[in-house]
């Protein structure tokens, strides 16, 4: 729902940014690669203009804007396709969804016309903590090093976990 996306991603960031400014604290805002339209066919860099297509992406870009407008010392970290084992809530992510689907013998359809940089959650957490504690400010891409389609990721997951890649 558009209203809740903006309430969480823009208004929430604005509220936190205001409190951080009042207390002199640095805000590290976690954003997304979805702020780009994905048509480039290669890795995006921090200095490239955003062109969000979805309500979610537009709300995240607004969250970035209010974060950076609140203080020149704030940091925006963009991540992409975050994955890992979520032992606390059991909530799935793209990689665990692929594993679960293939283990159940379900055929899945994955697109190959958009590239993403999958990001291992523990690595992202470590990197973002280091960046937040340092002097970096502005926008930083903190995604993984690879640039792959979701189809490619699915095939790698199937191969890694010895699952039936023909279901992809």
PLM regions: where:
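NAD(P)-cofactor binding segment of oxidoreductase domains
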Residues: 1-28
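Conserved internal alpha-helix within the Rossmann fold of NAD(P)-dependent oxidoreductases
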Residues: 13-16, 64, 128
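Helix C-cap/helix->beta junction micro-motif
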Residues: 19-23, 70, 161
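SDR active-site strand-loop-helix element
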Residues: 27-32, 37, 77-79
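Active-site "gating" loop of Rossmann-like NAD(P)-dependent oxidoreductase/epimerase domains
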Residues: 33-53
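Active-site helix of classical SDR
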Residues: 59
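NAD(P)-dependent short-chain dehydrogenase/reductase
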Residues: 65-116, 122-123, 129-130
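Mid/C-terminal beta-alpha module of Rossmann-like enzyme folds, strongest
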Residues: 127, 131-168
């Amino acid at each position: 729902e558009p209203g809740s996306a903006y309430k969480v991603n823009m208004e929430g960031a604005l509220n936190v940014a205001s409190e951080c400014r009042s207390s002199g604290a640095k805000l590290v805002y976690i954003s997304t690669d979805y702020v780009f339209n994905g048509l480039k066919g290669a890795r995006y860099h921090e200095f490239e203009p955003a062109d969000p297509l979805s309500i979610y992406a537009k709300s995240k870009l607004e969250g970035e804007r209010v974060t950076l407008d609140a203080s020149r010392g704030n940091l925006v970290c963009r991540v992409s396709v975050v994955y890992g084992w979520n032992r606390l809530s059991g909530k799935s992510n793209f990689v665990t969804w692929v594993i679960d689907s293939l283990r159940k013998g379900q055929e899945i359809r994955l697109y190959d016309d958009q590239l993403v940089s999958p990001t291992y959650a523990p690595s992202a957490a470590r990197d973002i903590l280091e960046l937040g504690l340092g002097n970096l400010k502005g926008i930083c891409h903190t995604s993984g090093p690879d640039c792959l389609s979701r189809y490619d990721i699915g095939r790698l997951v199937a191969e890694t976990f010895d699952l039936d890649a023909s279901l992809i």
